[in-house]
Amino acid sequence: MNLPELKEDFYKRYSSSDNYLHFTSNGILCTLLGHCGIENAPSLTCTLSMRVRMFARALDGNMIKIQSSAENKCFVYIFGTPPELFRGADKETVNLIRMLDNHKIKGAQILYDSTIPEFLSKKEAFSVSLIQSLMKVSSIEADALETAALSACSRPAAPYLATTATKSGYCTLLSSGIPKNYPLPLTGYKILSAHCTESERDRSGHIRTAFSSIRRMYPHISSITDITPKMFNSAKSAIKDKIALRYMYHLINETARIAAVTAALRRCDTRTLFREMNNSQKSMERFWDIGSEHLFLAHCAERLDGVAAVRFWKNGIIVIIEEDKIDHAINMIRHEFESNIGYQPTFCVSEAL
Protein backbone atom coordinates (compact mmCIF):
# COMPACT_ATOMS: atom_id res chain seq x y z
CA MET A 1 0.00 0.00 0.00
CA ASN A 2 1.45 3.37 -0.99
CA LEU A 3 1.10 6.49 1.14
CA PRO A 4 -1.93 8.03 -0.65
CA GLU A 5 -3.73 4.67 -0.37
CA LEU A 6 -2.95 4.47 3.36
CA LYS A 7 -4.29 8.00 3.81
CA GLU A 8 -7.44 7.15 1.86
CA ASP A 9 -7.89 4.04 4.01
CA PHE A 10 -7.72 6.24 7.12
CA TYR A 11 -10.62 8.37 5.90
CA LYS A 12 -12.65 5.27 5.03
CA ARG A 13 -12.22 3.79 8.51
CA TYR A 14 -12.79 6.93 10.58
CA SER A 15 -15.59 9.52 10.44
CA SER A 16 -14.91 12.97 9.03
CA SER A 17 -13.27 15.62 11.22
CA ASP A 18 -11.67 19.02 10.84
CA ASN A 19 -8.72 17.98 13.03
CA TYR A 20 -5.28 17.91 11.39
CA LEU A 21 -3.94 14.58 10.14
CA HIS A 22 -0.38 13.86 11.34
CA PHE A 23 2.06 11.41 9.73
CA THR A 24 4.90 9.51 11.41
CA SER A 25 7.28 6.89 10.01
CA ASN A 26 10.11 4.88 11.56
CA GLY A 27 12.24 2.14 10.04
CA ILE A 28 13.52 -1.06 11.59
CA LEU A 29 16.88 -0.54 13.27
CA CYS A 30 19.90 -2.20 11.64
CA THR A 31 23.18 -2.52 13.56
CA LEU A 32 26.22 -2.01 11.36
CA LEU A 33 28.79 -2.28 14.16
CA GLY A 34 28.64 -2.84 17.89
CA HIS A 35 25.62 -4.21 19.72
CA CYS A 36 22.70 -1.85 20.28
CA GLY A 37 20.71 -4.34 22.33
CA ILE A 38 23.44 -4.87 24.93
CA GLU A 39 23.46 -2.60 27.95
CA ASN A 40 26.45 -0.20 28.08
CA ALA A 41 27.77 -1.35 24.67
CA PRO A 42 28.46 1.12 21.83
CA SER A 43 26.78 0.74 18.45
CA LEU A 44 26.65 2.23 14.97
CA THR A 45 23.18 1.87 13.49
CA CYS A 46 20.94 2.97 10.64
CA THR A 47 17.24 2.54 9.94
CA LEU A 48 16.04 0.59 6.93
CA SER A 49 13.26 1.16 4.43
CA MET A 50 11.27 -1.66 6.11
CA ARG A 51 9.16 0.48 8.39
CA VAL A 52 6.04 1.37 10.32
CA ARG A 53 3.98 4.24 8.86
CA MET A 54 1.28 5.87 10.95
CA PHE A 55 -1.46 8.45 10.42
CA ALA A 56 -2.98 10.03 13.53
CA ARG A 57 -5.68 12.62 14.19
CA ALA A 58 -6.92 14.14 17.45
CA LEU A 59 -10.24 12.73 18.62
CA ASP A 60 -12.70 14.80 20.64
CA GLY A 61 -13.19 12.33 23.45
CA ASN A 62 -11.45 10.30 26.13
CA MET A 63 -10.36 7.36 24.03
CA ILE A 64 -7.63 6.23 21.63
CA LYS A 65 -8.49 4.06 18.64
CA ILE A 66 -5.75 2.15 16.81
CA GLN A 67 -6.16 0.07 13.66
CA SER A 68 -3.76 -1.80 11.39
CA SER A 69 -4.39 -1.46 7.66
CA ALA A 70 -4.02 -5.26 7.45
CA GLU A 71 -6.94 -5.92 9.83
CA ASN A 72 -10.55 -4.87 10.31
CA LYS A 73 -10.57 -4.94 14.12
CA CYS A 74 -10.05 -1.75 16.11
CA PHE A 75 -8.15 -1.52 19.39
CA VAL A 76 -9.87 0.93 21.76
CA TYR A 77 -8.41 2.31 24.97
CA ILE A 78 -10.62 4.50 27.19
CA PHE A 79 -8.57 6.74 29.48
CA GLY A 80 -8.39 5.35 33.00
CA THR A 81 -9.09 1.73 32.09
CA PRO A 82 -6.85 -0.56 34.21
CA PRO A 83 -4.12 -2.31 32.17
CA GLU A 84 -5.05 -5.58 33.92
CA LEU A 85 -8.16 -5.79 31.74
CA PHE A 86 -5.99 -6.23 28.63
CA ARG A 87 -3.89 -9.18 27.50
CA GLY A 88 -0.82 -9.77 25.33
CA ALA A 89 0.01 -7.14 22.72
CA ASP A 90 -3.01 -5.03 23.74
CA LYS A 91 -1.68 -4.77 27.29
CA GLU A 92 1.73 -3.70 25.96
CA THR A 93 0.02 -0.98 23.91
CA VAL A 94 -1.89 0.25 26.98
CA ASN A 95 1.30 0.36 29.05
CA LEU A 96 2.94 2.36 26.26
CA ILE A 97 0.05 4.85 26.10
CA ARG A 98 0.12 5.26 29.87
CA MET A 99 3.74 6.38 29.71
CA LEU A 100 2.17 9.69 28.63
CA ASP A 101 -0.23 9.91 31.60
CA ASN A 102 1.59 12.95 32.99
CA HIS A 103 1.49 14.80 29.65
CA LYS A 104 -2.30 15.32 29.33
CA ILE A 105 -2.66 13.55 26.00
CA LYS A 106 -5.77 13.90 23.85
CA GLY A 107 -7.88 11.19 22.36
CA ALA A 108 -6.73 9.98 18.95
CA GLN A 109 -7.64 8.01 15.86
CA ILE A 110 -4.68 6.07 14.46
CA LEU A 111 -4.13 3.90 11.41
CA TYR A 112 -0.79 2.26 10.66
CA ASP A 113 0.79 -0.22 8.32
CA SER A 114 4.06 -2.12 8.48
CA THR A 115 6.41 -3.34 5.77
CA ILE A 116 8.50 -5.16 8.39
CA PRO A 117 8.11 -8.94 7.86
CA GLU A 118 6.66 -11.08 10.64
CA PHE A 119 9.96 -12.83 11.39
CA LEU A 120 11.52 -9.49 12.41
CA SER A 121 10.37 -7.49 15.42
CA LYS A 122 8.69 -4.15 14.76
CA LYS A 123 8.57 -3.33 18.49
CA GLU A 124 10.94 -0.34 18.39
CA ALA A 125 9.55 1.13 15.16
CA PHE A 126 5.92 0.75 16.32
CA SER A 127 6.53 2.04 19.85
CA VAL A 128 8.41 5.14 18.70
CA SER A 129 5.81 5.84 16.00
CA LEU A 130 2.93 5.54 18.48
CA ILE A 131 4.54 7.81 21.08
CA GLN A 132 5.45 10.38 18.41
CA SER A 133 1.92 10.27 16.97
CA LEU A 134 0.26 10.75 20.35
CA MET A 135 2.58 13.65 21.14
CA LYS A 136 1.82 15.28 17.78
CA VAL A 137 -1.96 15.14 18.18
CA SER A 138 -1.59 16.48 21.74
CA SER A 139 0.93 19.23 20.82
CA ILE A 140 3.51 17.80 23.22
CA GLU A 141 7.15 18.63 22.53
CA ALA A 142 9.98 16.29 23.52
CA ASP A 143 13.57 15.73 22.45
CA ALA A 144 14.99 12.43 21.20
CA LEU A 145 16.10 11.34 24.69
CA GLU A 146 12.69 11.84 26.28
CA THR A 147 10.87 10.30 23.32
CA ALA A 148 13.14 7.25 23.52
CA ALA A 149 12.60 6.87 27.27
CA LEU A 150 8.81 7.00 26.81
CA SER A 151 8.89 4.59 23.86
CA ALA A 152 11.10 2.10 25.72
CA CYS A 153 8.41 1.71 28.40
CA SER A 154 10.92 0.63 31.08
CA ARG A 155 12.90 -1.56 28.66
CA PRO A 156 16.57 -0.77 27.77
CA ALA A 157 16.36 2.54 25.91
CA ALA A 158 19.31 2.26 23.50
CA PRO A 159 17.42 0.79 20.48
CA TYR A 160 14.66 3.38 20.92
CA LEU A 161 17.15 6.22 21.22
CA ALA A 162 18.91 5.07 18.06
CA THR A 163 15.54 5.01 16.28
CA THR A 164 14.51 8.50 17.42
CA ALA A 165 17.95 10.00 16.70
CA THR A 166 18.17 8.66 13.16
CA LYS A 167 18.53 11.02 10.21
CA SER A 168 18.02 10.25 6.51
CA GLY A 169 21.31 9.52 4.76
CA TYR A 170 23.18 9.11 8.05
CA CYS A 171 24.04 6.41 10.56
CA THR A 172 23.86 6.96 14.32
CA LEU A 173 26.58 6.40 16.89
CA LEU A 174 25.36 5.45 20.34
CA SER A 175 28.11 5.58 22.89
CA SER A 176 28.54 7.48 26.13
CA GLY A 177 26.82 10.85 25.76
CA ILE A 178 24.47 12.25 23.12
CA PRO A 179 23.85 10.26 19.89
CA LYS A 180 25.87 11.48 16.92
CA ASN A 181 25.06 11.17 13.21
CA TYR A 182 27.60 10.43 10.48
CA PRO A 183 27.17 10.36 6.68
CA LEU A 184 26.26 6.97 5.24
CA PRO A 185 26.65 7.25 1.44
CA LEU A 186 25.52 3.86 0.11
CA THR A 187 24.57 4.92 -3.42
CA GLY A 188 24.66 1.88 -5.71
CA TYR A 189 24.23 -0.56 -2.81
CA LYS A 190 21.28 -2.28 -1.17
CA ILE A 191 21.10 -4.03 2.17
CA LEU A 192 20.15 -7.68 1.82
CA SER A 193 19.23 -9.57 4.97
CA ALA A 194 18.98 -13.34 5.13
CA HIS A 195 17.34 -15.05 8.09
CA CYS A 196 17.32 -18.57 9.51
CA THR A 197 15.24 -20.20 12.25
CA GLU A 198 18.17 -20.72 14.62
CA SER A 199 17.69 -18.71 17.81
CA GLU A 200 20.13 -16.00 18.82
CA ARG A 201 21.96 -16.51 22.12
CA ASP A 202 21.36 -14.27 25.13
CA ARG A 203 24.78 -12.95 26.12
CA SER A 204 23.66 -10.16 28.44
CA GLY A 205 24.28 -12.02 31.71
CA HIS A 206 27.88 -12.90 30.82
CA ILE A 207 28.59 -9.33 29.70
CA ARG A 208 27.13 -7.82 32.88
CA THR A 209 29.39 -10.14 34.89
CA ALA A 210 32.49 -9.02 32.99
CA PHE A 211 31.54 -5.34 33.12
CA SER A 212 30.95 -5.51 36.89
CA SER A 213 34.36 -7.16 37.41
CA ILE A 214 36.10 -4.39 35.47
CA ARG A 215 34.17 -1.65 37.28
CA ARG A 216 35.35 -2.95 40.63
CA MET A 217 38.87 -2.04 39.53
CA TYR A 218 37.89 1.09 37.59
CA PRO A 219 34.76 2.50 39.29
CA HIS A 220 34.80 5.70 37.22
CA ILE A 221 33.80 3.96 33.97
CA SER A 222 30.14 4.20 32.96
CA SER A 223 30.06 2.24 29.69
CA ILE A 224 32.05 -0.31 27.72
CA THR A 225 33.26 2.56 25.52
CA ASP A 226 35.24 3.87 28.51
CA ILE A 227 37.25 0.65 28.86
CA THR A 228 40.64 0.92 27.17
CA PRO A 229 42.61 -2.16 26.07
CA LYS A 230 45.07 -1.42 28.89
CA MET A 231 42.27 -1.44 31.47
CA PHE A 232 40.91 -4.67 30.06
CA ASN A 233 44.31 -6.38 30.18
CA SER A 234 44.72 -5.29 33.81
CA ALA A 235 41.29 -6.50 34.84
CA LYS A 236 40.82 -9.67 32.80
CA SER A 237 42.37 -11.91 35.45
CA ALA A 238 39.46 -10.91 37.71
CA ILE A 239 36.90 -12.18 35.17
CA LYS A 240 36.45 -15.83 36.13
CA ASP A 241 33.73 -16.48 33.55
CA LYS A 242 35.73 -17.45 30.44
CA ILE A 243 32.73 -16.99 28.16
CA ALA A 244 32.25 -13.47 29.52
CA LEU A 245 35.94 -12.80 28.94
CA ARG A 246 35.61 -13.69 25.25
CA TYR A 247 32.51 -11.55 24.81
CA MET A 248 34.13 -8.56 26.48
CA TYR A 249 37.29 -8.94 24.38
CA HIS A 250 35.14 -8.70 21.25
CA LEU A 251 33.31 -5.62 22.59
CA ILE A 252 36.53 -3.78 23.46
CA ASN A 253 37.82 -4.33 19.92
CA GLU A 254 34.42 -3.36 18.53
CA THR A 255 34.79 0.03 20.22
CA ALA A 256 38.04 0.60 18.31
CA ARG A 257 36.41 -0.46 15.04
CA ILE A 258 33.56 2.00 15.56
CA ALA A 259 36.03 4.82 16.26
CA ALA A 260 37.90 4.07 13.02
CA VAL A 261 34.69 3.96 10.99
CA THR A 262 33.17 7.17 12.35
CA ALA A 263 36.41 9.02 11.61
CA ALA A 264 36.32 7.68 8.04
CA LEU A 265 32.62 8.45 7.52
CA ARG A 266 33.30 12.12 8.20
CA ARG A 267 35.12 11.93 4.85
CA CYS A 268 32.32 9.76 3.37
CA ASP A 269 34.81 6.86 3.23
CA THR A 270 32.65 3.72 3.12
CA ARG A 271 35.57 1.40 2.37
CA THR A 272 36.61 1.58 6.01
CA LEU A 273 33.04 0.80 7.06
CA PHE A 274 32.93 -2.29 4.83
CA ARG A 275 36.35 -3.48 6.02
CA GLU A 276 35.50 -3.09 9.70
CA MET A 277 32.10 -4.74 9.30
CA ASN A 278 33.88 -7.76 7.83
CA ASN A 279 36.46 -7.63 10.64
CA SER A 280 33.62 -7.49 13.15
CA GLN A 281 32.07 -10.52 11.51
CA LYS A 282 35.31 -12.50 11.87
CA SER A 283 35.62 -11.41 15.49
CA MET A 284 32.09 -12.59 16.22
CA GLU A 285 32.82 -15.94 14.57
CA ARG A 286 35.76 -16.37 16.93
CA PHE A 287 34.52 -14.89 20.21
CA TRP A 288 30.71 -14.55 20.07
CA ASP A 289 29.53 -18.20 20.03
CA ILE A 290 27.69 -17.95 16.74
CA GLY A 291 25.38 -20.84 15.80
CA SER A 292 26.18 -23.14 12.88
CA GLU A 293 23.29 -21.94 10.69
CA HIS A 294 24.26 -18.29 11.15
CA LEU A 295 27.85 -19.19 10.27
CA PHE A 296 26.80 -21.04 7.15
CA LEU A 297 24.65 -18.10 5.98
CA ALA A 298 27.59 -15.73 6.38
CA HIS A 299 30.01 -18.04 4.57
CA CYS A 300 27.53 -18.41 1.69
CA ALA A 301 27.30 -14.65 1.27
CA GLU A 302 30.83 -13.42 1.83
CA ARG A 303 32.33 -15.03 -1.26
CA LEU A 304 29.67 -13.79 -3.71
CA ASP A 305 30.36 -11.21 -6.39
CA GLY A 306 29.32 -7.65 -5.52
CA VAL A 307 29.32 -8.18 -1.75
CA ALA A 308 31.00 -5.32 0.12
CA ALA A 309 30.32 -6.41 3.71
CA VAL A 310 28.67 -9.21 5.69
CA ARG A 311 27.80 -9.17 9.38
CA PHE A 312 25.58 -11.11 11.75
CA TRP A 313 22.30 -9.34 12.55
CA LYS A 314 19.35 -10.58 14.60
CA ASN A 315 18.44 -14.13 13.47
CA GLY A 316 20.62 -14.00 10.37
CA ILE A 317 22.98 -11.69 8.49
CA ILE A 318 23.05 -8.36 6.70
CA VAL A 319 24.86 -8.06 3.39
CA ILE A 320 25.78 -4.74 1.81
CA ILE A 321 25.74 -5.59 -1.87
CA GLU A 322 25.77 -3.90 -5.27
CA GLU A 323 22.22 -3.38 -6.52
CA ASP A 324 22.58 -5.39 -9.73
CA LYS A 325 23.96 -8.45 -7.90
CA ILE A 326 21.05 -8.99 -5.50
CA ASP A 327 19.03 -11.55 -7.46
CA HIS A 328 22.07 -13.72 -8.12
CA ALA A 329 23.10 -13.54 -4.46
CA ILE A 330 19.65 -14.58 -3.23
CA ASN A 331 19.52 -17.53 -5.61
CA MET A 332 23.01 -18.72 -4.64
CA ILE A 333 22.47 -18.38 -0.89
CA ARG A 334 19.05 -20.03 -1.06
CA HIS A 335 20.34 -23.00 -3.08
CA GLU A 336 23.47 -23.59 -1.01
CA PHE A 337 21.72 -23.15 2.33
CA GLU A 338 18.85 -25.48 1.43
CA SER A 339 21.23 -28.11 0.02
CA ASN A 340 23.28 -28.20 3.22
CA ILE A 341 20.92 -27.16 6.04
CA GLY A 342 17.64 -28.53 4.70
CA TYR A 343 15.33 -25.53 4.38
CA GLN A 344 15.25 -22.16 2.63
CA PRO A 345 16.23 -19.00 4.51
CA THR A 346 14.03 -15.91 4.22
CA PHE A 347 15.27 -12.71 2.58
CA CYS A 348 14.56 -8.98 2.72
CA VAL A 349 15.96 -6.30 0.42
CA SER A 350 15.98 -2.75 1.73
CA GLU A 351 17.82 0.54 1.72
CA ALA A 352 19.46 2.49 4.50
CA LEU A 353 17.39 5.62 5.08
Describe the role of every protein-language-model region.
Residues C36-G37, F126, R271, N315-I318:
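Short, flexible micro-motifs
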Residues P159, A309-I317:
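Conserved phosphate/anionic-ligand binding catalytic regions in large, soluble enzymes, centered on
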Residues M1-L21, L29-A41, R87-L184, T197, ...:
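Gly/Ser-rich oxyanion-binding loop with an adjacent helix/lid
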Residues M50:
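Residues that flank catalytic or metal-binding motifs in active/ligand-binding sites
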